[in-house]
Amino acid sequence: MNIQPYLIPLATVQFEEEIKKSTFITYLAHTPSIEDAKAFVDSIKQKHSDARHNCWGFVAGRPQDSMKWGFSDDGEPSGTAGKPILAQLAGSNVGEITAVVTRYYGGIQLGTGGLVKAYGGGVQQALKLLQTIEKKITIKLNLTLDYALVPLTQSIMAQFQAIEVEADYSEKVAFVIELECLQVEAFTQTIINKSGAKVIVAHNDNV
C-alpha cells in the first residue's frame, strides 16, 4: 500500500476558448473513483447534448495508478482527443481528476495535429487554473487505556493531529482514532514511551 500523500482537485474548473470557429469548453473535476469519473462525464454530456463531441480522460486514483485511467475520443479521429487529454492529466501529478472537453464544431476542420493541440491545450490551460489540496492517506487505530491516561493520550493525539472517531468509557477507556499513515510509527512510539507502555495500540480492522 502506497501511503504517500498526493494532490487532488479542490473545486471544478472551466476553461473556454475558440479555435477556428470551433468552441472548446474544458471541465476539470474531483472524481475519487472510476464510477464518479463516469458520472461526471455523463453530466457534462447531458449539459452539452447539442455539442458535436464531448471527449474525456480521467485519472481516478493516485496520479501514477494507470489501472484507474480512462479516455475517449467520442467520435473524433482516433488518438486526437482522449489520449492528449489523458496525457495532460497524467503529467499533472494530480490524482482523482476527470477532464471533459466539449467541442461545438464551427465548420472548419482542424486536422489531426490541430485537434491534438486543441484538446490537450485546453486541459493544459484549465490545469493552470486548478486549485489543489493534499490528500493524506489515513488509518484507524484502537487505543485502550486507564482513565488516568486520558489527558496524556488526548494531548498526544492533538500533537499528531489524530481524529477521535469513537470513544467508549467503560471499565477502561477505548478510543478509535484516525491518523495519517506516515505518522503511525512516531505516534505509537511516543504514546508508549510517555505512558510507560500502559496505552495499548492496535490496528482497527474496520477500515
Place the predicted regions along the sequence by residue.
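N-terminal positively charged helical leader segments and presequences
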Residues: Y169-K172
